[in-house]
Amino acid sequence: MKYGDLVSVVQHKFQISCYEPVFHHSKDRIDRDYQAVSYLSKVEWEISGLDPSSAAISSVLEFEEVCRLTNERFTAYSDGGYIPPALNQVLHLMQGIISRVLGDLRPDEWIEACRFGPGACFKVRGTTSYDKIGAKPSVTMDFALLGLALVNSSPSWISSIRGQGKDDFSGDEPLGYPKPLTLGDLQLVRGGNFSLVPKKATTHRDIEVQPALNVYAQLGLGAMIRKRLKRSGLDLDRQPAKNRELARLGSIYNHNATIDMRGASNTISKKLVEFLFPVRWFCALDICRTRYLENFPEDGDLLPLERFSSMGNGYTFELESLIFLSIVRATADEMGVKLRMQSNTHVYGDDIICP
């Protein structure tokens, strides 16, 4: 900063190897240096020579290529291709863990759990539930029929969309029940809307703004997965504080490792989820996700997705928490390491703590 080289400042990487042997350096100094590097990387400066939007777009394409290759590998495995024995064992352990955590998928529970969240929806103005219930719902073509059934199950929702004039009530229906909507009352879209939000000076974060009915159903599945994770010992509602405390203790006693992955949700591929999850759960997750990115600056405005879901999808956080938990548990089982969920193992999205 002294010489005005802001590019080098925001691109600087903290490397613990620079402090080895660690006992020659003050822990306070290491902490201060790490905090300084982290803070400066996130300052929202406009710096000549850096294009955070282009960096984010390149990152999306990079992770899509990773997912494409992963999908090809799982397709080859399904067709009888070679899979390393150790990897095969871990993957099947993960299947069993995920199946036990999830149990049965109950459609009635899914319908009850569906809701709108606080974020934006594609093709809908406003972010409140009132805005979303009163707007013409957006939905992907794959989910249109199920989304229509969700709306038509709620007379008040139909009335909010169509109004309550005398012509909106059907003589064939119970008194006061509005005419059901048809597909023509929905906004059919091809996928989610590509959007960027500030993250660091060097790159933005990509967000996929979901169609209204898709995210309404996605949040229901997310709530169901969250409830089942809690029954299995992982309470995502209390995890942030628990993870911070375990990370602090690990830094003092050196008995826990902390793992924070780059682009974690963007590297969960379609075929991975299909391989790991029970069929009914996979079908439910798959039908309400988006398969394309609209308004993507490259690839002709419409990007077919190799990833299964991303930030913006209503169940991505719970989905990745379950997958990463299964990786930790399966790997520990294979290595003969004993895990204690409340003392040495925690997962919160892509923030992982393990022995």
Where are these regions (language model features)?
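Core nucleotidyl-transferase/polymerase catalytic module
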Residues: M1-S17, S159-P355
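Non-catalytic, polymerase-adjacent accessory regions of viral genome-replication enzymes
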Residues: M1-S195
